[in-house]
Regions:
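Bacterial N-terminal signal peptides that target proteins for export
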Residues: 2-13, 49-53
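N-terminal signal peptide c-region/cleavage motif recognized by signal peptidases
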Residues: 20-24
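Hydrophobic alpha-helical bundle signature of multipass membrane enzymes
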Residues: 26-123, 127-163
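Outer-membrane beta-barrel proteins
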Residues: 67-70, 141, 185, 189-194, ...
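Membrane-embedded beta-strand positions of outer-membrane beta-barrel proteins
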Residues: 96, 194-198
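Alpha-helical transmembrane segments that form the membrane-embedded catalytic/substrate-binding core
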Residues: 126-130, 168-188
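Outer-membrane beta-barrel architecture
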Residues: 132, 136, 182, 206-208
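Outer-membrane beta-barrel "beta-signal"
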Residues: 200-211
């Protein structure tokens, strides 16, 4: 198992900031002073259907890998930690959305509209989920397989895409990334996957060993 250094959260944050800096580096409003509405663009790689492909594709691949590999290998353990991570991030993001009630840029040009009934812009649940999925893998393999950092491109893409379709403000996607990364760090450092501990033993063995 890779050494768990305290530098991992910092490195993850730096990597996303580098990727998103050109996109968010503009004066605006909101809690960080960077929120501003982008011109609507639902075309090309930014199409909503492509966003869904990344989101649900990553989730399906993650769950499929966990079920197939079980908990007996390094990769399988990381997959189950990732499942824990995405569940925690998804539940927390949904609770925060309901609590903060922030209007989306598609509904208002004012990023300071909070606590509105039915509004759920903050934080970005999709960025949180994708970040939560990849973080355990990045933490586990970052030292012996540095290319794993390339997975950070997935939440970076989704963050930009969500802003382009006016679904989120800049601070929404940054908060989503922070939430997902924190969930992933918790799941990976905990060691034993929570969800796996309440499932029948066959899930820990994995389908590849069960047939």
């Amino acid at each position: 198992m890779a050494e768990r250094g305290s530098s991992a959260p910092t490195a993850a944050a730096i990597s996303l900031c580098v990727l998103l800096a050109p996109a968010i580096a503009q004066a605006g409003s909101g809690p960080l002073g960077i929120d501003h509405r982008w011109n609507y663009d639902n075309s090309g790689i930014w199409k909503r259907s492509n966003q869904d492909l990344v989101r649900y594709g990553a989730l399906a691949a993650d769950i499929g890998l966990a079920l197939w590999a079980g908990d007996g290998t390094r990769l399988g353990r990381s997959a189950w930690q990732s499942v824990d991570s995405v569940v925690l991030a998804g539940v927390t993001a949904e609770a925060a959305k309901r609590a903060f009630g922030r209007e989306r840029p598609g509904d208002s040009n004012d990023p300071n509209q909070w606590f509105k009934s039915g509004e759920r812009s903050f934080p970005s649940g999709e960025v949180a989920e994708i970040s939560a999925i990849i973080t355990p893998y990045v933490l586990e393999y970052r030292q012996d397989h540095p290319a794993v950092w390339g997975l950070e491109l997935l939440p970076a893409y989704d963050a930009i895409a969500r802003m382009k379709v006016q679904a989120h403000w800049q601070s929404d996607v940054l908060a989503g990334f922070a939430l997902g990364t924190a969930s992933g760090i918790w799941a990976q450092q905990r060691g034993t996957p929570v969800i796996l501990s309440v499932l029948p033993h066959g899930f820990a063995v994995g389908f590849k060993h069960g047939f």
